[in-house]
């Protein structure tokens, strides 16, 4: 071997370059994603489009599904111009039958589905507990929660059928880990998405389907304008109060000051390579989470001191 390079060292160097070379600042195994297909709801803009671009850069086929046809067409052309194999399909995530159609079209175009990114979501109504109305709650539940349920229900069998494994990526929020006052519906649905994701990890492990949940804080998207896609059946006859409008305006300003959406897609790819379950985009929120976990730990400690629970302290935990 020239320059004193041993055969073993050369092999190790080759493996290192294959599995850890730099691509857009991230470590990438090209074979992990290349030629496979991802279905992304809410893929026409914002976080969904950012993820579509990042996966496209890894040579994946992408199916972008969105309720906004105009944005969908624009996003499709943008991805095509970047050399990404793309299929654009209109989708209302709250309708299971439309998810079925997306799955059918994805399989017809690309043959197999390997990943679903349940990204589509709405900000929901803002306001006090007593001011929230049923239609507003139903809108947020149907899109943010049932949209994820339907996406996984339809796409999981398609991922299982080829036996190659795959991914489910659910987009939640830091709000799901620590509640936002006056945004009860949004907070509740994002907490539910995190819990669902935690449930699915153990269920799908045997099928080599990796589950992740993305929990961003404020990102520069148009989630504050999600009202534009609110169908008639979810619209309320009750006018928004001035204080509710003020809360919505404040939230909008926070979103506009958020991080660049392009970072999020790249971060998702980085996290999937490392098989991360919780995917965070705002490490500066760690201290807030530590406050919560400390409070939980303290509550457990107090329960251990309760005379009512003394016989339970040493009981073994039985899992199903």
Predicted features along the sequence, with ranges:
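Canonical Rossmann dinucleotide-binding motif of NAD(H)/NADP(H)-dependent dehydrogenases/reductases
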Residues: 31-63
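Active-site-adjacent segment of SDR/Rossmann-fold oxidoreductases
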Residues: 58, 178, 199-209
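The beta1-alpha1 cofactor-binding region of Rossmann-like NAD(H)/NADP(H)-dependent oxidoreductases
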Residues: 69-70, 89-101, 134
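Substrate-binding pocket helix/loop in short-chain dehydrogenase/reductase
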Residues: 127-129, 133-138
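Active-site helix of classical SDR
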Residues: 152, 189
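Residue(s) in the substrate-gating loop at a strand-loop-helix junction
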Residues: 173
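SDR active-site lid
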Residues: 206-279
């Amino acid at each position: 071997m020239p320059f004193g390079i041993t055969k073993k060292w050369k092999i190790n160097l080759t493996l290192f370059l294959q599995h850890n070379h730099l691509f857009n600042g991230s470590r990438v195994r090209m074979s992990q994603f290349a030629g496979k297909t991802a279905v992304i709801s809410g893929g026409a803009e914002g976080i969904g489009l950012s993820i579509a671009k990042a996966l496209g850069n890894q040579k994946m086929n992408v199916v972008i599904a969105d309720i906004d046809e105009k944005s969908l067409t624009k996003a499709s052309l943008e991805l095509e111009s970047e050399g990404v194999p793309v299929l654009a399909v209109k989708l209302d995530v709250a309708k299971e039958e439309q998810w079925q159609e997306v799955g059918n079209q994805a399989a017809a175009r690309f043959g197999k589905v390997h990943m679903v990114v349940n990204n589509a979501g709405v900000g929901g109504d803002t306001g006090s507990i007593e001011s929230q109305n049923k239609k507003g709650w139903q809108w947020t539940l149907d899109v943010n929660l049932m949209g994820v349920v339907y996406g996984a229900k339809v796409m999981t069998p398609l991922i299982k059928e080829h036996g190659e494994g795959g991914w489910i990526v659910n987009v939640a929020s830091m709000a799901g880990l620590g509640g936002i006052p006056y945004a009860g519906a949004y907070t509740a649905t994002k907490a539910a998405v995190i819990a669902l994701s935690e449930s699915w990890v153990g269920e799908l492990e045997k099928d080599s389907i990796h589950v992740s949940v993305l929990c961003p804080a404020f990102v520069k998207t148009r989630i504050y304008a999600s009202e534009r896609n609110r169908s008639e059946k979810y619209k309320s006859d009750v006018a928004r109060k001035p204080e509710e409008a003020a809360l919505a305006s404040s939230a909008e300003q926070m979103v506009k000051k958020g991080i660049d959406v392009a970072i999020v897609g790249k971060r998702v790819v980085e996290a999937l390579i490392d098989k991360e379950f919780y995917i965070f985009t705002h490490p500066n929120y760690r201290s807030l989470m530590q406050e919560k976990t400390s409070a939980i730990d303290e509550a457990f400690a107090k329960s251990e001191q309760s005379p009512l629970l003394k016989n339970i302290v040493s009981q073994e935990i039985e899992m199903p």
